[in-house]
């Protein structure tokens, strides 16, 4: 299957979408399946993801960004290899009043929604989250 940016990702008179993925290793399956997919590498961690997101917005002016990648499940209700959409993101290491929830603005497309926490190390869980990643809060 070939991705058709002009007709699928960016139909006439529609929003221009870019897909941010932290690493080339994570992006490889999408690039192999859809060589023309509008993929950009965001980098690993909050600082890299925030900088890449800001740069991509400033340089490419997309209408919509999608952050995709591999996350760890901190809740057994999330199956291995399950695709989910993040409804909200927290930074797990921030204490008390600083532990705010960043709401995601997304189109669920039939995906199960979960809460996520962005963490710099494993084993740090924010209350009520099902998955963890290293970039989400910086992206939102």
Kindly label every feature range from the protein language model.
Residues 8-9:
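Acidic, Ala/Val/Gly-enriched low-complexity intrinsically disordered segments
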Residues 20-23:
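Gly/serine-rich nucleotide phosphate-binding loop at the start of the catalytic core
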Residues 14-16, 26-140:
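Glycine-rich phosphate- or other oxyanion-binding loops that anchor nucleotides, phosphorylated ligands
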